[in-house]
Amino acid sequence: MAEKAPPGLNRKTSRSTLSLPPEPVDIIRSKTCSRRVKINVGGLNHEVLWRTLDRLPRTRLGKLRDCNTHESLLEVCDDYNLNENEYFFDRHPGAFTSILNFYRTGKLHMMEEMCALSFGQELDYWGIDEIYLESCCQARYHQKKEQMNEELRREAETMREREGEEFDNTCCPEKRKKLWDLLEKPNSSVAAKILAIVSILFIVLSTIALSLNTLPELQENDEFGQPSDNRKLAHVEAVCIAWFTMEYLLRFLSSPNKWKFFKGPLNVIDLLAILPYYVTIFLTESNKSVLQFQNVRRVVQIFRIMRILRILKLARHSTGLQSLGFTLRRSYNELGLLILFLAMGIMIFSSLVFFAEKDEDATKFTSIPASFWWATITMTTVGYGDIYPKTLLGKIVGGLCCIAGVLVIALPIPIIVNNFSEFYKEQKRQEKAIKRREALERAKRNGSIVSMNLKDAFARSMELIDVAVEKAGESANTKDSVDDNHLSPSRWKWARKALSETSSNKSYENKYQEVSQNDSHEHLNNTSSSSPQHLSAQKLEMLYNEITKTQPHSHPNPDCQEQPERPCVYEEEIEMEEVICPQEQLAVAQTEVIVDMKSTSSIDSFTSCATDFTETERSPLPPPSASHLQMKFPTDLPGTDEHQRARAPPFLTLSRDKGPAAREAAVDYAPIDITVNLDAGASHGPLQPDSASDSPKSSLKGSNPLKSRSLKVNFQENRASAPQTPPSTARPLPVTTADFPLTTPQHMSTILLEEALPQGQPPLLEADDSAHCQGPSKGFSPRFPKQKLFPFSSRERRSFTEIDTGEDEDFLDLQRSRPDKQADPSPNCLADKPGDARDSLREEGCVGSSSPQNTDHNCRQDIYQAVGEVKKDSSQEGYKMENHLFAPEIHSNPGDTGHCPTRETSM
């Protein structure tokens, strides 16, 4: 999963809400921050490792990782979001599942419900060759693809024929086009349908008249005594022929290609339907003599018979008749095979039956050609019975002829039937396809449907979209809308979120690895994603300038306008130096290594420094034990100029190198500010930087019922600054404030020792050195002789610290009354019962008790000692300390002994 967006930047912000494309360094950083990448194909999200995509580097997804510029990314994908590490492809999501599995498993399969042609197009888009298909899917894929290609070829031929009907090179193209559609395309309009129905009625009427003219009752004898057509029926036939002639001439005149019109099979049928009538009239009127009429009479009869071909004109209006004609034309191989089988059978069986029946009296099988008729009707299983064999041998031959005829005819007939069925379906499909294409063309001409590339459409309408969104954003300035116009950076929303809520230990190590190596700040990527258009930065800037001219009140540049609701940008810096303090001042004492770091600290404790430390307040909740030390800075310090504000520390990951470098920490209290100085030159022992905790709450668990106030320090997070990250152990710790008017070390002691008692109850703590423990830590129980130890209570993560300056005098009195007890260095852990905690606090100054049952907890010890003693033991290399602030512990009298496990507060 991609790394989460920094808290300073809204995670829901897309690239389309920003003005300029991202820099190459931002694109490279977003790819290197995570081992995984999100791929959104048609709205369906997929998550895959980068190394999985690297298996096919020459494919589209394989090239995705090498694209480091905005233009190269848009050549590979349609859109992207660097904050989410997500890349969008506007393609078929179902086909991509098979393609992504090919990257993972190396096996390419095609889903059963997937169209072969569509799957082939998807393979071409993603850059994968179809030869990688598995054998189980390859045959099905190629079969479907060939079938689809054949259908597309036929449709293309039909469309070429339709597109070949050009009327531009002729006179009156529009009128001729309308007339052609009226006569040739019955479905083009209502008038064309009516005209087709009238034409069919004339065909039927002429056929009926032709049939009735052969009836003797309706015939009339001419002057030569020969029967002739009825006059009334002749008039009906003349009207029909006139209609057919007019239709044929109009079709010929309106046709775009005259030669092609003559070669058309349907047009040939129309010509044969009307030509015999005119030939008969010409022959009859030109030859009036009896002798000449007798010579041409037979020719006239032939042309009269040809008039029956008018019935074939119905094929123009019937898809079934057209399919029959095309089937016979396409099945000429099967028809030829059928005729060949029949001819061979007829020849064989007619010869056999002739030799079997020639010796019989009054036989009808007088010759082999005379036997052809019997063999034909026998093989076709008709059997008229006008001729049949009489002998036994002839009957056997007749039986074999019947069986052979059934087998011979049954072989090619199904092929012909199948061809007819397929062609009929194909004709229906082509008719629907032609209608659909014509409807789309008409809609395109009318402007209803615009056929263009989606990217080009977005690119052309980008200006309109920007202006519309800008106007909509002006009316909604008071609302916290995330989907704001990317040309209005003054209204960008920066969501403030604690880092501990959006990150984990592992994510910190991965996310800021590159930043720690480059030793630079994390650069917020303000150029996420935009719409999938190929707009360059220059075009966007030009559009930006135009909008700023038209809208002078809107300042896209946040530096050019005042924003009273946003505090000024400032940065904090921590000055790390050694502070020379008197012997009574506190310093960090030496401590040994903490073995089980996973249960004692958490990286998320660093991230809790996210709020302001402007004034002290009393927490309404009782502070639990083992909390964290947190600091806070005001947003605007009085009297502090912007040039005096230091820069925040860079974002660094926790170093995993365990080096011997330790840090000496001292707390310097001044009337104006407080500076926590960490000197990396001191060597208290090797550090333990690898203190990442699996669970942030694992280091917060404890059984000590101690109730005191903890110090909280919060870094003021600037809204426009980069998100804060846990500082590295190799960097100084920033602590700077100006709102802490403490002057003495005893004042700090008051802060550390003050209990969270009910209101009205005086503090019970004395200035005794007491021990506070939660049980012996697993693995070690160090002792620190000659140490001044003071209690420092902890609280749960992100809890606020109470600093009540009104009780300073009580603590100073306690300090003066028991000066001898403060010098006691021996640590001691009292094992009193929880019920006797208050008595022990009053009598011995202990601030907490622990039970022996809590020995499995990994306790922590936060110890302060005098600066002089720390300097004295700075040469010791056997001790190790954690790179965090340590709270002091109050120990009991010198006579008491015990083990005080370390208690650590990480920041």
Curated annotation (Swiss-Prot):
<feature type="region of interest" description="Disordered">
    <location>
        <begin position="1"/>
        <end position="22"/>
    </location>
</feature>
<feature type="short sequence motif" description="FFAT">
    <location>
        <begin position="605"/>
        <end position="611"/>
    </location>
</feature>
<dbReference type="InterPro" id="IPR003131">
    <property type="entry name" value="T1-type_BTB"/>
</dbReference>
<dbReference type="Pfam" id="PF00520">
    <property type="entry name" value="Ion_trans"/>
</dbReference>
<keyword id="KW-0597">Phosphoprotein</keyword>
<feature type="topological domain" description="Extracellular">
    <location>
        <begin position="389"/>
        <end position="395"/>
    </location>
</feature>
<feature type="topological domain" description="Cytoplasmic">
    <location>
        <begin position="1"/>
        <end position="190"/>
    </location>
</feature>
<keyword id="KW-0472">Membrane</keyword>
<feature type="region of interest" description="Disordered">
    <location>
        <begin position="887"/>
        <end position="907"/>
    </location>
</feature>
<dbReference type="GO" id="GO:0032809">
    <property type="term" value="C:neuronal cell body membrane"/>
</dbReference>
<keyword id="KW-0966">Cell projection</keyword>
<dbReference type="InterPro" id="IPR000210">
    <property type="entry name" value="BTB/POZ_dom"/>
</dbReference>
<feature type="transmembrane region" description="Helical; Name=Segment S5">
    <location>
        <begin position="333"/>
        <end position="354"/>
    </location>
</feature>
<dbReference type="InterPro" id="IPR005821">
    <property type="entry name" value="Ion_trans_dom"/>
</dbReference>
<comment type="subunit">
    <text>Homotetramer or heterotetramer with KCNB1. Heterotetramer with KCNS1 and KCNS2. Interacts (via phosphorylated FFAT motif) with VAPA and VAPB.</text>
</comment>
<dbReference type="GO" id="GO:0006813">
    <property type="term" value="P:potassium ion transport"/>
</dbReference>
<dbReference type="InterPro" id="IPR003968">
    <property type="entry name" value="K_chnl_volt-dep_Kv"/>
</dbReference>
<dbReference type="InterPro" id="IPR028325">
    <property type="entry name" value="VG_K_chnl"/>
</dbReference>
<dbReference type="InterPro" id="IPR011333">
    <property type="entry name" value="SKP1/BTB/POZ_sf"/>
</dbReference>
<keyword id="KW-0407">Ion channel</keyword>
<feature type="region of interest" description="Disordered">
    <location>
        <begin position="761"/>
        <end position="859"/>
    </location>
</feature>
<feature type="compositionally biased region" description="Polar residues">
    <location>
        <begin position="525"/>
        <end position="534"/>
    </location>
</feature>
<feature type="region of interest" description="Disordered">
    <location>
        <begin position="680"/>
        <end position="742"/>
    </location>
</feature>
<keyword id="KW-0851">Voltage-gated channel</keyword>
<keyword id="KW-0813">Transport</keyword>
<feature type="modified residue" description="Phosphoserine">
    <location>
        <position position="448"/>
    </location>
</feature>
<dbReference type="GO" id="GO:0005251">
    <property type="term" value="F:delayed rectifier potassium channel activity"/>
</dbReference>
<dbReference type="Pfam" id="PF02214">
    <property type="entry name" value="BTB_2"/>
</dbReference>
<dbReference type="GO" id="GO:0046982">
    <property type="term" value="F:protein heterodimerization activity"/>
</dbReference>
<dbReference type="GO" id="GO:0072659">
    <property type="term" value="P:protein localization to plasma membrane"/>
</dbReference>
<comment type="similarity">
    <text>Belongs to the potassium channel family. B (Shab) (TC 1.A.1.2) subfamily. Kv2.2/KCNB2 sub-subfamily.</text>
</comment>
<feature type="modified residue" description="Phosphoserine">
    <location>
        <position position="608"/>
    </location>
</feature>
<feature type="intramembrane region">
    <location>
        <begin position="381"/>
        <end position="388"/>
    </location>
</feature>
<comment type="function">
    <text>Voltage-gated potassium channel that mediates transmembrane potassium transport in excitable membranes, primarily in the brain and smooth muscle cells. Channels open or close in response to the voltage difference across the membrane, letting potassium ions pass in accordance with their electrochemical gradient. Homotetrameric channels mediate a delayed-rectifier voltage-dependent outward potassium current that display rapid activation and slow inactivation in response to membrane depolarization.</text>
</comment>
<dbReference type="GO" id="GO:0005886">
    <property type="term" value="C:plasma membrane"/>
</dbReference>
<feature type="topological domain" description="Extracellular">
    <location>
        <begin position="355"/>
        <end position="368"/>
    </location>
</feature>
<feature type="transmembrane region" description="Helical; Name=Segment S1">
    <location>
        <begin position="191"/>
        <end position="212"/>
    </location>
</feature>
<keyword id="KW-1133">Transmembrane helix</keyword>
<dbReference type="GO" id="GO:0030425">
    <property type="term" value="C:dendrite"/>
</dbReference>
<feature type="topological domain" description="Cytoplasmic">
    <location>
        <begin position="255"/>
        <end position="265"/>
    </location>
</feature>
<keyword id="KW-0631">Potassium channel</keyword>
<keyword id="KW-0630">Potassium</keyword>
